[in-house]
Swiss-Prot record:
An MF annotation (GO) of this entry: rRNA binding
Gene (name only): rpsG
GO CC terms of this entry: small ribosomal subunit
Species whose genome carries this gene: Clostridium botulinum (strain 657 / Type Ba4)
Lineage: superkingdom: Bacteria
Pfam families in alphabetical order: Ribosomal_S7 (PF00177)
PROSITE patterns from the UniProt entry: RIBOSOMAL_S7
The protein's name in its UniProt record: Small ribosomal subunit protein uS7
Length: 156
């Protein structure tokens, strides 16, 4: 913890093409070894594939997919009297977005298509239709929280 007050959170700049901070966060998460240009190309190419396959606006599909992936609840381990309980907690908006992007990329990287842009496009299209591995991860997280609802009174 800092001794001198609160540290200001750095804000990301909106991306040049769609003017969206969420897309910038997606690009930053795709990026490996500081190669932002490559990450941008992957992201924008995936958006083009989405527009081509779905016939809808890529940004619209992306937003729908993100809403279908972002979790509302999660469980957090809490140790009480020698026993560890999985306590369900609400997810803050910032963390919801981060988890959504993280789960989407993990699911996309595990897919079978040839290039990352095809995998990302496929996962986003699946997520916008409420299918796919990232949506399953969200459902599993919600089921876990629902199953442990009895321990909600141990909340932080």
């Amino acid at each position: 913890m800092p001794r001198k007050g609160h540290i200001a959170k750095r804000d990301v700049l909106p991306d040049p093409l769609y003017n969206s901070k969420v897309v910038t966060k997606l690009i930053n998460s795709i990026m490996l070894d500081g190669k932002k240009g490559v990450a941008q190309k992957i992201c924008y190419d995936a958006f083009e594939i989405i527009a081509e396959k779905s016939g809808k606006d890529a940004m619209e599909v992306f937003e729908t997919a993100m809403n279908n992936i972002m979790p509302l609840l999660e469980v957090k381990a809490r140790r009480i009297g020698g026993a560890t309980y999985q306590v369900p907690i609400e997810v803050r908006p910032e963390r919801r977005q981060t988890l959504g992007i993280r789960w989407m990329l993990i699911a996309a990287r595990k897919r079978g298509e040839r290039s990352m842009r095809e995998r990302l496009a496929g996962e986003l299209l699946d997520a916008s239709n409420n299918t796919g591995a990232a949506v399953k991860k969200r459902e599993d997280t919600h089921k876990m929280a629902e199953a442990n609802k009895a321990f909600a009174h141990y909340r932080y």
